[in-house]
Curated annotation (Swiss-Prot):
PANTHER family: CYTOSINE-SPECIFIC METHYLTRANSFERASE, DNA (CYTOSINE-5)-METHYLTRANSFERASE 1. Residues 1-148 are annotated as: Interaction with DNMT3A. Zn(2+) binds at C351, C354, C412, H416. This is DNA (cytosine-5)-methyltransferase 1. Residues 752-877, 969-1097 form the BAH domain. The gene is DNMT1.
């Protein structure tokens, strides 16, 4: 807009006018440049201006300060009133400020001095008078005694750089508040826009009259001058009418309310900024010339303006009287209206065109190049033509010419520089641009040789090119006349364009990264972004996570565009885990149509995906997968076709709502387009991305609260069937008569003879179900039930966890049997036992023989026994009938009876018969013997201690929070904090058995069903008066003896443990504790009454109970307790030769080494940094860094070494195979189709199973993420188990929580264990430590059946939980970005856990205590996260902060009404985007570089408020699952140190996984984080290893026992 002037009425000279000294004025300007808060700024200015204020004003300021201190006035109200008082005191009577510093005859606020004064000033300067800019005069202020009214002026703005300075110009401006009836978050209504057009038309008419009259003299009577009270009153009338029509309430014409920190903009929310804005100082001095050059010829300024003075005193008095009357009416109406109106914070004023905030200090204006001409003139310039006169121009008139444009700027009609990617073009806002046009072949970005142009456009479309792997990404505009490829922006536009370039380059990074890493996580993507060096043209040091989140919408749209170039059956890369997390975090809107976006992606078509690489498989594995897939693909593809149309559309997004294209393959098959209608597929242009996202998320979501599922269905028959005596007859005489039952050996049914031991098919009650199969174990007849048989059931493969993947002819033994009537028998069948061959271990990799030659419908086979509750496949139990019970022997009954007998508590070895009770020396339960003097585990509720501890730590009550400072704190309504141990249960109580007794019945006999034990209580350190801090420094297995006793039910005993007096041990305490499980020691006794520690009494030091055991106490008890340990030391087990596939840095192998069961001779790891780390920690291992498929192919081909000369393990060499194959390659979609089946068939899981089949190791372990058991409706799990069963392995699966095995981290892992025939199948290890119950939901649902592992310690454990404090409190303090690879510890270990991890180093050096260097903004956020437990991003203050790089982080604006969360207690808004009002997201609402990340409140309502992001760890809590890249906004969430302003270090993460401090890592910091995050926690691996060791010991004992028997038999 050109600067204009308007004749102004000359005010009378003020009675009191003064000017500020120059030094004060300078200091006021300096304050504006400083980054002070509004409060600080006002305070400083008051100090400067205090001596210039009248006494009356000073008194009023004192009163205001008193009210503020008494909280009678809010801080905002106080600041508003202070500015109001200053505005009054330092202004003239008519509102014109009276400072004596003039510029061009005008005052700062647009009021004009009298012509006389103007001439005097010019004469004094000795210069000819310059043209006076025509300015709009603001409304006049009220007199000092009245309340001020809203200031408003016409939107004409002066853009002079030298302007009059006023006091109020030194205060920050803010938006005017809307009237109460107006919705604060709504954009200007159509009525107000029309009204503004009317106002503009009025101004044009006045201006044209001015031109006709030439130079207007002093204002004529009756003439309405723009900016005067009469025009303002007219505008107010219109506004009042509009509001009345909306609210149907009386509406005042003025609004006196002012927002405390903002002045009202001239012309309301749609007008330009007032003249007082200091941003004009940032413009070039040539701007007035440029602006003038834009005007139409008839709008040119006159050469000279000579304002005349006329006497208007009468008119002034009338206007003043009318104005005061109007103001009183307004005030009365306002008071009435505010009683019912909701007063809330309103939007700051915006430009009506580009919707930018007019008070934004970064708002810029366009500046045309010199001598700029219009677009049409440029396009006809011969310098841009690439043809000579003899050449034809274009092949078609539809082709647009292409040129290059440099030194360009893009702006709206009001002259504001605008970005092009905020949705303005899509909303038909006309954006123009200027610059220097050059021929298309020019590469020089300088404006030399170009043609300067202005007002190009409007822009119809913008497009991107350069996604071809090159270094550059190009941006172009299309207008109605030409296309322009952009080169360099103008200096003014460069900051805006750099943001655009930044997002283009980030999109390029993301697309190219996903091309090669489609299964990457969000943390992996952040790693890629942060490690990519930005192009030099961007003037950026680094890309950050904030950069990605800022441009997330744009980036996702580019990825969607890339996916559209692929085939319809290809997996979209926008469904990769990292993109799904980005879409959720940033609140990206999917499914925007490109046509509506007016954005074109000009890039080469997506390269054809060649599909997955071929996996090397053995014949057995290949046959299983191929056979099953052939049937399942057809079935699932049929289901997909039936459900695709409904399933793939949400019906809400833009893509779903557009019509079919009629051109794609799916449309051509539709009936409406003349097709057959068979495929029933959605139009390819209507493939809903929201539904695809939902399906991908559903595949990975696992419900922690698994509902109660019915147990696997039993095969009981519910009712009797009528006997048919004619078809059933006994063969031979009864072999045995037992009471009423007569047992037979044979029976004839329908001319078919059956005998005991035969197998039969049984008719089910439900005829729709297949026949049941059973072994006949007894035949008898009795008078009540008739002819009966005892059925020992077989379980069909489909009734196991294998489901449909099982062999249809394979059966499994189960411990399930029942009595049945013979009439239920359908026919005789044959069930063959397939025993493993003697050479089983060497048969791997060869062509598998068919287990059954053909299916005749009556022949089946079985190999294994199946546990239906624990999903365990084991070798059939060896139970043989005796001669006297062959006629009715049932292996199932025998085993079930044996188990019941074991479970029943019993007493043995009576000691003494006392009055009322009988004492015993021994009791048994679950096969475990408990003697007097043994230590026992008891539930926490078994007994209490005689000391009253302080109540457990609870969260402090929530105190009132300043919602203005902490606007997101309201989201913390839940007390639950992820990573907190407040709900962690207590560990077991431990007691030493003093007596075992039973009370006597009334008949004098002992009641052996009610066994009691009397125990001496042991105190743990946390149970003493020293409470929890004592346990932190003490050993985890330290106890204190006490003479306190308790009587407990023997049924409550949870297990046996060893408790020894430390001074009596032959070895050191550390060796004793490490020598076996369940070991405790005590050195002192605790007296609860005196709260003192004493020497233990003599009877405590003895492991027996003197005088009670009649010589069976001390010695025998000790030998009984230590018996397993002695056997372990006697039998030396050879270590298993181990191959670790997908080894990573070696966490699994490290745990097995600590358990002492394996020696890892070979490892395969393709990622070089992890392979190097494995080498560092396992120097004797051969580490292969090749593809596992290549290695297996070499071995199967008979090769001995690989290409690098490394010796390959041969068949028979590998005794243990372990690994965690990555399975993300097929984790994107919940349903299989032919392509995902193909991916799975060639996945690393299949390769790993092929390794198992070829090498046939004694033990096999597969470790993976918890969701492994749920992928593809558990299909991955089923097929893995199916392969193992087909190989002949015993196998099982379960989910373990690493936190229960001694790490301060929640990490649930799926484990598949397998053992070769003849080896005992290990159980899963019982938990060692208590842990948060929420993280211990370990059951698995497969096909609506709930499976659990064999673990029995569900509610407690032997040891307390390990905390963050235990893990890392001894590590020295470091800063953000610390990079010293080796430092000293600076202190001794403080906890038991730290002593374990530090080990016994001679000269301890702390390695890898380094942390990521976060960006300046992230560092500032971390610095402002409080240190209180549970703190996260919701505790960030909404303030401006100076960052370490010198930039300023802004406050977050809340401009929208959040329908869900409402307003704050002070009425402030809580929404940051229009989506909270139920509207589509507004691109212009995005905010960046704010201390509170804009994306989190934007999407928080639908993502649990992003609890935990930017969260601090809690000293007494635990880590979330350690990931590969600790990011404050990543999945792991709480990664900030509890007390230091940084993310956790590599060493802290390694400790959270349980790695010893001596364990070496390799590579840069992100490599090391990835190595740690991908590893199996060694303590978890150790626990599993000890279970394998137990099985090996059991077999060794069995072999030793058999050998002794054999030798004895020979003798």
């Amino acid at each position: 807009m050109p600067a204009r002037t308007a004749p102004a009425r000359v005010p009378a000279l003020a009675s009191r006018a003064f000017s500020l000294p120059d030094d004060v004025r300078r200091r006021l300007k300096d304050l504006e440049r400083d980054s002070l808060t509004e409060k600080e700024c006002v305070k400083e200015k008051l100090n400067l201006l205090h001596e210039f204020l009248r006494t009356e004003i000073k008194n009023q300021l004192c009163d205001l300060e008193t009210k503020l201190h008494k909280e009678e006035l809010s801080e905002e109200g106080y600041l508003a009133k202070v500015k109001s008082l200053l505005n009054k005191d330092l202004s003239l009577e008519n509102g014109a400020h009276a400072f004596s510093r003039e510029a061009n005859g005008c005052l700062e606020n647009g009021s004009q001095t009298s012509g006389e004064d103007c001439r005097v000033v010019m004469a004094e300067k000795g210069k000819p008078p310059k043209p006076v800019s025509r300015l709009y005069t603001p409304r006049r202020s009220k007199s000092d005694g009245e309340t001020k009214s809203e200031v408003s002026s016409s939107p004409r703005i002066t853009r002079k750089t030298t302007r009059q300075t006023t006091i109020t110009s030194h205060f920050p401006r803010g938006p005017a508040k809307r009237k109460p009836e107006e919705e604060p978050e709504k954009v200007k209504s159509d009525d107000s826009v029309d009204e503004e057009k009317d106002q503009e038309e009025k101004r044009r008419r006045v201006t044209s009259r001015e031109r006709v009259a030439g130079l207007l003299p002093a204002e004529e009577p009756g003439r309405v001058r723009p900016g005067t009270h009469m025009e303002e009153e007219g505008r107010d009338d219109k506004e009042e009418k509009r509001l009345r029509s909306q609210t149907k309430e009386p509406t005042p014409k003025h609004k006196a309310k002012e927002e405390p920190d903002r002045d009202v903009r001239p012309g309301g929310a749609q007008a330009e900024m007032n003249e007082g804005e200091d941003k004009d100082e940032k413009r070039h001095r040539s701007q007035p010339k440029d602006l003038a050059s834009k005007r139409r010829p008839e709008e040119k300024e006159p050469e000279r303006v000579k304002p005349q003075v006329s006497d208007e005193k009468d008119e002034d008095e009338k206007e003043e009287k009318r104005r005061r009357t109007t103001y009183r009416e307004l005030t009365e109406k306002k008071m009435t209206r505010t009683k019912i109106a909701v007063v809330s914070k309103t939007n700051p004023p915006k430009c009506t065109e580009c919707l930018q905030y007019l008070d934004d200090p970064e708002l810029r204006y366009e500046q045309h190049p010199p001598d700029a001409v219009e677009e049409i003139q440029i396009l006809t310039n011969e310098r841009l033509s690439i043809f000579d006169a003899n050449e034809s121009g274009f092949e078609s008139y539809e082709d647009l010419p292409q040129h290059k444009l440099t030194c360009f700027s893009v702006y709206c009609k009001r002259g504001h520089l605008c970005p092009i990617d905020t949705g303005l073009i899509e909303k038909d806002v006309e954006l123009l641009f200027s610059g220097s046009a050059k021929p298309i072949y020019e590469d020089d970005p300088s404006p030399e040789g170009g043609i300067n142009g202005k007002n190009f456009g409007p822009i119809n479309e913008w497009w991107i090119a350069g996604f071809d792997g090159g270094e550059k990404a190009l941006l172009g505009f299309s207008t109605s006349f030409a296309e322009y490829i952009l080169m360099d922006p103008s200096p003014e536009y460069a900051p805006l364009f750099s943001v655009m370039q930044e997002k283009i380059y980030i999109s390029k990074i993301v697309v190219e990264f996903l091309q090669s890493n489609p299964d990457s996580t969000y943390e992996d993507l952040i790693n890629k972004i942060e490690t990519t060096v930005p192009p030099c043209m961007l003037n950026l040091n680094r890309f950050t996570e904030d950069s990605l989140l800022r441009h997330a919408q744009f980036v996702v749209e580019q990825v969607e565009s890339y996916d559209r170039a692929g085939d319809s059956d290809e997996q979209p890369i926008f469904l990769s885990p990292c993109m799904r997390d980005l879409i959720k975090l940033a609140g990206v809107t999917l499914g925007k149509r490109r046509a509506e976006r007016r954005q074109t992606i000009r890039q080469p078509a997506k390269e054809k995906d060649k599909g997955p690489t071929k996996a090397t498989t053995t014949k057995l594995v290949y046959q299983i997968f191929d056979t099953f897939f052939a049937e399942q693909i057809e079935k699932d593809d049929k289901e997909d076709k039936e459900n695709a149309f409904k399933r793939r559309r949400c019906g809400v997004c833009e893509i779903c709502q557009q019509p079919e294209c009629g051109k794609c393959k799916a449309c051509k098959d539709m009936v409406k387009f003349g097709g057959s209608g068979r495929s029933k597929q959605a139009c390819q242009k209507r493939r809903c991305p929201n539904m695809a996202m939902k399906e991908a998320d559903d595949d990975e979501e696992v419900d922690d609260n698994i509902p109660e599922m019915p147990s696997p269905k039993k095969m009981h028959q519910g009712k009797k069937k009528k006997q048919n005596k004619n078809r059933i007859s006994w063969v031979g005489d009864a072999v045995k008569t037992d009471g009423k039952k007569s047992y037979y050996k044979k029976v004839c049914i329908d001319s078919e003879t059956l005998e005991v031991g035969d197998c039969v098919s049984v008719i089910p009650d439900d005829s729709s179900k297949p026949l049941y199969l059973a072994r006949v174990t007894a035949l008898w007849e009795d008078s009540s039930n008739g002819q009966m048989f005892h059925a020992h059931w077989f379980c069909a493969g489909t009734d196991t966890v294998l489901g449909a993947t099982s062999d249809p002819l394979e059966l499994f033994l189960v411990d399930e049997c029942e009595d049945m009537q013979l009439s239920y028998i359908h026919s005789k069948v044959q069930v063959i036992y397939k025993a493993p061959s003697e050479n089983w271990a060497m048969e791997g990799g060869v062509d598998p023989e068919a287990l059954m030659s053909e299916d005749d419908g009556k022949t089946y086979f079985y190999q294994l026994w199946y546990d239906q509750d624990y999903a365990r496949f084991e070798s059939p139990p060896k139970t043989q009938p005796t001669e006297d019970n062959k006629y009715k022997f049932c292996a199932s009954c025998a085993r079930l009876a044996e188990m019941r007998q074991k479970e029943i508590p019993r007493v043995v070895e009576q000691l003494q018969d006392l009055e009322g009770r009988v004492l015993y020396s021994l009791a048994t339960k679950n096969g475990v013997q408990y003697r007097v003097g043994d230590g026992v585990y008891l539930p926490p509720e078994a007994f209490t201690f005689n000391i009253k501890l302080s109540s457990p730590v609870k969260r402090p009550r929530k105190e009132p929070v300043d919602e203005a400072l902490y606007p997101e704190h309201y989201r913390k309504y839940s007390d639950y904090i992820k990573g907190s141990n407040l709900d962690a249960p207590e560990p077991y109580r431990i007691g030493r058995i003093k007596e075992i007794f039973c009370s006597k019945k009334s008949n004098g006999r002992p009641n052996e069903t009610d066994i009691k034990i009397r125990v001496n209580k042991f105190y743990r350190p946390e149970n003493t008066h020293k409470s929890t801090p004592a346990s932190y420094h003490a050993d985890i297995n330290l106890l204190y003896w006490s003479d306190e006793e308790a009587v407990v039910d023997f049924k409550a005993v949870q297990g046996r443990c060893t408790v020894e007096y430390g001074e009596d041990l032959p070895q050191c305490l550390q060796d004793f504790s490490a020598g076996g499980p369940d070991r405790f020691y005590f050195l002192e006794a605790y007296n609860a009454k005196s709260k003192s520690f004493e020497d233990p009494p003599n009877h405590a030091r003895s492991t027996g109970n003197k005088g009670k055991g009649k010589g069976k106490g001390k010695n025998r008890t000790k030998s009984q307790t230590c018996e397993p340990s002695e056997l372990e030391t006697e039998i030396k087990l050879p270590k298993l030769r181990t191959l670790d596939v997908f080894s990573g840095c070696g966490g699994l192998s490290e745990g097995f080494h600590q358990a002492g069961i394996s020696e890892t001779l070979w490892a395969i790891e393709m990622w070089d940094p992890a392979a190097q780390a494995f080498r560092l920690n396992n120097p004797g291992s051969t580490v292969f860094t090749e593809d596992c498929n290549v290695l297996l192919k070499l071995v199967m081909a008979g090769e001995v070494t690989n290409s690098r000369g490394q010796k390959l393990p041969q068949k028979g060499d590998v005794e243990m195979l372990c690994g965690g194959p990555p399975c993300q390659g097929f984790s994107g979609m919940n349903r299989f189709n032919s392509r995902t089946y193909s991916k799975f068939k060639n996945s690393l899981v299949v390769s790993f199973l092929s390794y198992c089949d070829y090498y046939r190791p004694r033990y096999f372990l597969l470790e993976n993420v918890r969701n492994f058991v749920s992928f593809k409706r558990s299909m991955v799990l089923k097929l893995t188990l199916r392969c193992l069963v087909r190989m002949g392995y015993q196998c099982t699966f379960g989910v373990l929580q690493a936190g229960q095995y001694g790490v301060a981290q929640t990490r649930r892992r799926a484990i598949i264990l397998a053992a070769a025939p003849g080896e005992p199948l290990p159980l899963f290890p019982e938990p060692l430590h208590v842990f948060a119950p929420r993280a211990c939901q370990l059951s698995v649902v497969v096909d609506d059946k709930k499976f659990v592992s064999n673990i029995t310690r569900l509610s407690s454990g032997p040891f307390r939980t390990i905390t963050v404090r235990d893990t890392m409190s001894d590590l020295p303090e470091i800063r953000n970005g610390a990079s010293a690879l080796e430092i000293s510890y600076n202190g001794e270990p403080q906890s038991w856990f730290q002593r374990q991890l530090r080990g016994s180093q001679y000269q301890p050096i702390l390695r890898d205590h380094i942390c990521k260097d976060m960006s300046a903004l992230v560092a500032a956020r971390m610095r402002h996260i409080p240190l209180a437990p549970g703190s996260d991003w919701r505790d960030l203050p909404n303030i401006e902060v100076r960052l370490s790089d010198g930039t300023l982080a802004r406050k977050l604006r809340y401009n929208y009404h959040d329908k869900k969360n409402g307003c704050s207690s002070s009425g402030a808004l809580r929404g940051v985007c229009s989506c909270v009002e139920g509207k589509p997201c507004e691109p212009a609402a995005r905010q960046f570089n704010t201390l509170i990340p804009w994306c989190l409140p934007h999407t928080g309502n639908r993502h649990n408020h992003w609890a935990g992001l930017y969260g601090r760890l809690e000293w007494d809590g635990f880590f979330s699952t350690t990931v590969t890249n600790p990011e404050p906004m990543g999945k792991q969430g709480r990664v900030l140190h509890p007390e230091q302003h940084r993310v956790v270090s590599v060493r802290e993460c390694a400790r959270s996984q349980g790695f010893p401090d001596t364990y070496r890592l390799f590579g840069n910091i992100l490599d090391k984080h990835r190595q740690v995050g991908n590893a199996v926690p060694p303590p978890l691996a150790k626990a599993i290893g000890l279970e394998i060791k137990r099985c090996m010991l059991a077999k060794a004992r069995e072999s030793a026992s058999a050998k002794i028997k054999e030798e004895a038999a020979k003798d």
